[in-house]
Amino acid sequence: TVQPVDATTWYNDVYVGRQFDATITGLDAKNITARAMLERFVSDNGKNFVNYNNPAYDELYAKARACTDDAEQTAVYQQMETMLTETAANLYLQDMADLVAVRSDLTGYTFYPIYAQDLSTVGYSE
C-alpha cells in the first residue's frame, strides 16, 4: 500500500529513521559533485537513506577518494555508477526537463536548474 505523507514525516521516518519498505520521492542531484552524489550510497554514509549496503561499492568509493589522477578517478566513478545500475540501488522514474524557450522581447528571465521558475522579474522590452 502506498501511503502519502507530508515532507516532515518523510524526512523523519524515511530519511532519518529508515522506517520504510520502499519510497518514492523527488531528488535533484544537478548541483552536487559526482563524489557527493556517489558517496550517498556508501554503506555507512548518513545520507544513504535507501540503505544501500555493498562492500564492493564501498571499496570502489575508497579507491576513488584515494585517486590523484582525474582520468583514473572518473573511471572508478563509472564503475560505481555501473554497479548502482546493475544492483538496482535506485529506480529513477523521471529526469527533470531543463529546457526553456522565451520570446525575444521578454527580459529579466533567470534560468533555475529546478522545476520551479521565478517569473516575478520577467517583463517585455520596449
Where are these regions (language model features)?
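Bilobed periplasmic-binding protein-like "clamshell/Venus-flytrap" ligand-binding domains
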Residues: 22-26, 68-104
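Short, solvent-exposed coil/turn elements at secondary-structure transition points
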Residues: 6-8, 28, 70, 99, ...
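Extracytoplasmic/secreted proteins, especially bacterial periplasmic and envelope-associated proteins
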Residues: 9, 13, 33-36, 56-63, ...
